[in-house]
């Protein structure tokens, strides 16, 4: 039991605090206020006092008997076969508790001492006392028995001075042996009294022999002195407490029984001293951890952790991930020690172990060509490379990041050709981040366009200097001053106007100004003082990645520092692998690639995202560990993002009709185009319809994609990829819609048309005529008929109507009949009287009948 205050104890027992304080004072416990602490020993003392005050006695000795039986088998050899003999050993032990009657023995002892002192004072000589003692047979034996009992009690007190009262043993002992044990206690008390009488008599006789002359005068003083000495004398047998248990083993010898009993008591004492304490564990918590994992680390049930989270206002399931801070609060609240684990320690260790020390040498600049679509970026690069790259692109537009390096008379330059279409915003941003100089191509006849502004923003965000190439100067509509004025509004000031941006007029068609452009680029690179360490391990960025059926995963990388060699172990984003082959932009195999050189590498176990950094690591095991760590981190982040999105949209979508979704399975040839398409399709739609990408990936359309589209009722979109034979068979058999595209414009337009067709129709009401009720009369065929005058427009028999009374719509329905004189007519124009029969409604004089028409309005996104 833990220590509690007097107030808490009073609440537990259901008694007033004042009454409890009075009872504690009566029991000899000094307590002043209700905030004082009550220990276990004080509780026991108070309980004993209350029981005595109610007439209950503690003098009943109790005992418990334990029986144990063991059976063994002995093999006896003799004539014939061996015989087995079963030997059964039975033991019985009885545990007896001495009662609280020892207090009565104390009082009896005091009376015996006083009586012995009085008798000793009355005797005159020592010889008379000795004769009296000799007349008592067995006295010496009794004294020896008492001394042995005292010695045993002293040993037991020494061994168990700190043992707590064994209340459970007291309650389990039977009360059937109360009488016999009380007789034994009485015999022990008589023996102690006789021993005390003998010792007091001897002391009194010795005192009287020394001072016979003052025997009469000091007789009362001697009696008081004996009482005072007996008061300070150590108490022998009565010191045994009620919690002391004597074990008697009936089949053991009298000498071994006390020893074994003491050993058992010592063991029980050790067990009792062990207080039940909660196990404090060291919980290692990573950046993200699920509720089930946290519960397992603390060795508790997951429900307990969920309850703690609910108390903190967090609703979570067993498999849901929680962040490190929340997990730390839960673990500390449950009494455990927390050790925060930085999961990226493995990644940091690998990256820090790679050294890029060495001699720095100048490197070629990496130049990105940016601009609006159809402004001539790729054509300009064609003229520089003396190649026809633009003719190979579908639709004449660039849909991938092309990486090339060109040897010029003035030095080597590496070019990155980025797409200009709006869907490739992320690809342009990646191109600006991994480049040194940006060539901004602006058509002289078109000026600054939206993607031109975006390219300027990307270049400024990356801190990359600009060189403006004013293209299409060979056209008659060319106006370079217009380009300068529009770019100056974007804070791109030409050098001629006092700025720091070089403007070079060029023509990709005729080649005019190309040399000046290269000169400007090399001049800008000299000002940047670009350097790298060629002897270090390779490091750079992934430009593009794709999945080739014959070659596997192919990644286009740009080496920014060090040298990438054939056979190196490359870690790129969430994937790793050994470089099995390296191919340059001309399709030639190379053994190494230095700084600023773009190459294609084969051998990765997946297609990394465009923009991921790659690095050469010395150990494949470390590379695998880092890649797996990144994959797990990305998966947990994605799950958390989905969970947060679902919780945010839970109440928004409550009560609303279901949003119509167009399910799409999207497959592309390269990773960059996949990201661009996913981003472009996600922007299409509104609160009624939207695009849902069921699955996406790089590579051809497989049987798995076809089965997934069949189960989700999705359409399959292939961008520069085709379906294999098994996938085509499923598509033809099940009637799945499969579409191939090579231009991104067409995908976006077709998806917009499909979503437009899914929109709910919208109707507009046009009022075509009004009529005023002048009179009403009954007709045996149609019931009530209203005589009306057509005020505006025309009244048609087959169109819906409204009835207005005091300019308030009171009825909406349809006409039952329309007559001009006695003839049924289809319409009645303005200024003409007619008879109108309204179905299921009675009109009054002065009402206005309004005829309207519902027109369906085509909706668009």
Swiss-Prot record:
Residues 260-269 have a biased composition (Basic residues). The keyword Cytoplasm applies. Residues 107-272 are annotated as: Disordered. Residues 115-128, 210-228 have a biased composition (Basic and acidic residues). Keywords: Cytoplasm, GTP-binding, Initiation factor, Nucleotide-binding, Protein biosynthesis. Residues 471-474 are annotated as: G4. Residues 507-509 are annotated as: G5. GO terms for cellular component: cytosol. CDD domains: IF2_eIF5B, IF2_mtIF2_II, mtIF2_IVc. It is found in: Cytoplasm. Disulfide bonds: none annotated. Residues 148-158, 169-180 have a biased composition (Polar residues). Residues 362-531 form the tr-type G domain. Residues 396-400 are annotated as: G2. InterPro entries: DNA-bd_dom_put_sf (IPR009061), EF-G-like_DII (IPR053905), IF2_assoc_dom_bac (IPR013575), IF2_II (IPR044145), IF2_N (IPR006847), P-loop_NTPase (IPR027417), Small_GTP-bd (IPR005225), T_Tr_GTP-bd_dom (IPR000795). GTP binds at residues 371-378, 417-421, 471-474. It holds the Pfam family IF2_assoc. Residues 371-378 are annotated as: G1. GO terms for molecular function: GTP binding; GTPase activity; translation initiation factor activity. Belongs to the TRAFAC class translation factor GTPase superfamily. Classic translation factor GTPase family. IF-2 subfamily. One of the essential components for the initiation of protein synthesis. Protects formylmethionyl-tRNA from spontaneous hydrolysis and promotes its binding to the 30S ribosomal subunits. Also involved in the hydrolysis of GTP during the formation of the 70S ribosomal complex. This is Translation initiation factor IF-2. It comes from Hahella chejuensis (strain KCTC 2396). The lineage of its organism: Bacteria, Pseudomonadati, Pseudomonadota, Gammaproteobacteria, Oceanospirillales.
